[in-house]
Amino acid sequence: MESIGIFFGSDTGNTENVAKLIHKYIGTNISSIHDIANTNKKDIELFNILIFGVSTWYYGELQCDWDDFLPTLKKINFNNKIIALFGCGDQEDYSEYFCDGIGILYNVIRLSKNVRFIGSWTSKGYSFECSKALDKNKNFLGLVIDEDRQPEQSNQRIIQWTKKIKTELNSLLN
């Protein structure tokens, strides 16, 4: 399997911790992990398979490092790349903006031709009012983690999602 680049932005450490677990469960021999705060355009362009992790802040805003990187992200050509997204959010205190960061990244990346997204995730088991991270079938565009309200479910969700990612990658690459 090709090398997978895992890029995350984190203020509190939650998204970084999720990224580290994804790195572990995907396989440290086939993936590398990068803080978006120390990333440039070329770092991302090296990979054909990318996993982006973002948290949502305040009223549906990107985590600050992703917000700073957004102009660069818009310049990257994601044609023929495979993308998976994950995010952290608080479904109780920010129920109207739950994990909107995933949707913001998705809407930038999807403008590239032939980009493939993998890793959609069920919205069952979460309680929120609204999210930009939902697709037309009301599934999340990627893995959603709520360390504030459901920390006991995080590890199992990450394990299940990384298995799903591996299965989807195997079918796309074989």
Swiss-Prot record:
- Where the record annotates domain Flavodoxin-like, the positions are 4-166
SUPFAM superfamilies membership: Flavoproteins (SSF52218)
Q: Which controlled-vocabulary keywords does the entry list?
A: Electron transport, Flavoprotein, FMN, Transport
The lineage's top-level taxon is Bacteria
Which cofactor is recorded for it? FMN
- One of this protein's Pfam families, by short name? Flavodoxin_1
Q: What residues form the membrane-spanning segments?
A: none
Q: Which residues form the signal peptide?
A: none
Q: From the UniProt record, which GO molecular function terms apply? A: electron transfer activity; FMN binding
Q: Which family does it belong to?
A: Belongs to the flavodoxin family.
Q: What does this protein do?
A: Low-potential electron donor to a number of redox enzymes.
Name the chain's protein. Flavodoxin
Q: Which gene encodes it?
A: fldA
